Amino acid sequence: MEQTRRARLTGLTAALLTVAAILWTLFASPSIGVVADGSYASAAEGLALRYAEESIPTGQRVEDFAYEDTAYSTLLFASRTSVGAAVALVRLATHPFGLGFSTRYLAVVYALLMGWGAYLLANGLARRSRTAAILATLGLPLALANPAVIGYLNSLYAVGASIAYLLLFLGATVYCLCREKGCGVQWTLLVLFAAQLMLRTMAQMMVLLPAAVLAVVLCAVHSCPGRAERPLHAA
């Protein structure tokens, strides 16, 4: 259908602009990052990472880390926050090749996740409102290219993960609810997956638990195959 094709094109445009804006700001501004302090070292330790250098002066920007011995399952399932899931992805792509960990790699993972969320959000909105889809497509890159946002993405702090997972959750919810009824339970599962990642980023995100539960319930009712509209037959 023409509407579906247009919605997909809008979503793809939003995704490309969002990822490009984040990565451009990240790599064009080498000074954006987090400086060393005691709490940052503790955050790294909780993710099986340590400073790549033996001694780093307090106040120096830190991006590079070395890996501690740990199992991937520990990062994925035993980590206190869902930041561990993103760190595990970076570790899987770098550690086997003898590469160290960089928060810039982590920022790229977050950028791709937010690109996915932007695609779902703009795709869903385009099925209902062209104006809303255009606003989302143009507004997301402008908002996310903020140096303050990039600073959190280029760090081990949970704020960066919460931003990425929140956008993925919003995009998945809007996409599911804007599709036709009875579109399939896989979209509800995507919303549930994004919700649990979002809620596990840090304790403060638990205030969104009621909204997450409501979104999952609404998506389940909307996407259930039994809810598909059936054509009326003349008597």
Where are the regions that the model predicts?
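Hydrophobic transmembrane helix bundles of membrane-integrated enzymes that assemble
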Residues: 2-29, 80-235
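Extracytoplasmic loop-helix module adjacent to an early transmembrane segment
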Residues: 20-95
